[in-house]
Amino acid sequence: MTQRHLVVMAAGTGGHIIPGLAVAQEMQHRGWTVSWLGTEQGMENRLVPPAAESGIEMDTIAFSGLRGKGLLHTLTGGLRLLGAFAACAKILRRRATTAVLGMGGYVCFPGGLMASLLGKPLILVNADAALLMSNRALKPVADRIAFGFDGAAAATTRQAVVTGNPVRAEIETLPEPPVRYAGREGPLRVLVVGGSLGARVLNETLPQALALLAPAERPRVLHQTGQLNRDGVKEAYAAVGIDDGVEVLAFIDDMAARLAHCDVVICRAGAVTVSELCAAGVASVLVPLIVSTTSHQRDNALYMAQHGAAIHLPQSELTPQALAERLRTLDRPQLLGMAEKARALSRPRAAARVADEIERLVRKDGL
């Protein structure tokens, strides 16, 4: 049988890239080869392990979208888009592509359109309940759209299937919360995650909030800041006299181990983040990102809070005083209960479900 090859398209943020890696690994376990289509400067160049380690070779194109970067950028956008179309078509042919998976990011529009024109099955993963912008554009040519959550968009999309969001296998297979929480003593363990790009409001608020707590009340904190913010956050903790019990990292490579170790996570409420919290079974304080055009993160946070799986703390209410009071009142029995409720909301085997859809389309097309 001819070797089957999947091209994964994902760029820009960990929320696109990390679930793509989960599906890529699942397809490799099924005997497929996998390559990655990203952008020249994107985070995918760091997050996707080298081919010698992962077996995933990287192809990149020079494309960063059409909007919001000045008049000249917009005026030359058509030429750059044509160049991106040509580059994607060349890559898909050279890779002898069997199917194409779009996870999100600028690369998905030219890559997805070329996949359709070349007759390759095109599967899109839509992390939120509402359709993402690139997926709206590609909806007419997509063979399948795998939704992370139920919602009106999935119900009204002909090609829709609700799979849940793909989660790293090492997170999905963590022990149940009661096993992890058993025997824990001492200060609470707080994991602060601003996402792969960092979250400014969390970086600014956490040091001030901890400074309001007496030393005996302070949790131990691991704070992930984003690549550009590490030094500034370390200085902020030092400025308020907190030198002990806090570890500051730009990025967390072994997220599963960190989730397993912590009692509670303070983070944004992106769809992939929420899916990982549920898969792991971890309590959380969710501070949704404020975006004028969507309410996705707020909806995610409310959903978790309504099920007792998280505390929803709107950014408009996030002050050092409010966060300090939240931390002061948390205890492990309460957090264990939240963790168990989060685990109950998980959708196991999402990566395998997406892989099933890919193989189903390939069989249908006789490839």
UniProtKB/Swiss-Prot annotation:
Gene Ontology molecular functions: UDP-N-acetyl-D-glucosamine:N-acetylmuramoyl-L-alanyl-D-glutamyl-meso-2,6-diaminopimelyl-D-alanyl-D-alanine-diphosphoundecaprenol 4-beta-N-acetylglucosaminlytransferase activity; undecaprenyldiphospho-muramoylpentapeptide beta-N-acetylglucosaminyltransferase activity
Catalytic activity annotation: di-trans,octa-cis-undecaprenyl diphospho-N-acetyl-alpha-D-muramoyl-L-alanyl-D-glutamyl-meso-2,6-diaminopimeloyl-D-alanyl-D-alanine + UDP-N-acetyl-alpha-D-glucosamine = di-trans,octa-cis-undecaprenyl diphospho-[N-acetyl-alpha-D-glucosaminyl-(1->4)]-N-acetyl-alpha-D-muramoyl-L-alanyl-D-glutamyl-meso-2,6-diaminopimeloyl-D-alanyl-D-alanine + UDP + H(+)
Keyword entries, A-Z: Cell cycle, Cell division, Cell inner membrane, Cell membrane, Cell shape, Cell wall biogenesis/degradation, Glycosyltransferase, Membrane, Peptidoglycan synthesis, Transferase
Residues making up the signal peptide according to the UniProt record: none
Pathway assigned in UniProt: Cell wall biogenesis; peptidoglycan biosynthesis
EC number: 2.4.1.227
Coiled coil: none
Compartments, record wording: Cell inner membrane
InterPro entries (alphabetical): GlcNAc_MurG, Glyco_trans_28_C, GlycoTrans_28_N
Annotated function: Cell wall formation. Catalyzes the transfer of a GlcNAc subunit on undecaprenyl-pyrophosphoryl-MurNAc-pentapeptide (lipid intermediate I) to form undecaprenyl-pyrophosphoryl-MurNAc-(pentapeptide)GlcNAc (lipid intermediate II).
NCBIfam families documented for this protein: murG
Name of the protein described by the UniProt record: UDP-N-acetylglucosamine--N-acetylmuramyl-(pentapeptide) pyrophosphoryl-undecaprenol N-acetylglucosamine transferase
Species the sequence originates in: Methylibium petroleiphilum (strain ATCC BAA-1232 / LMG 22953 / PM1)
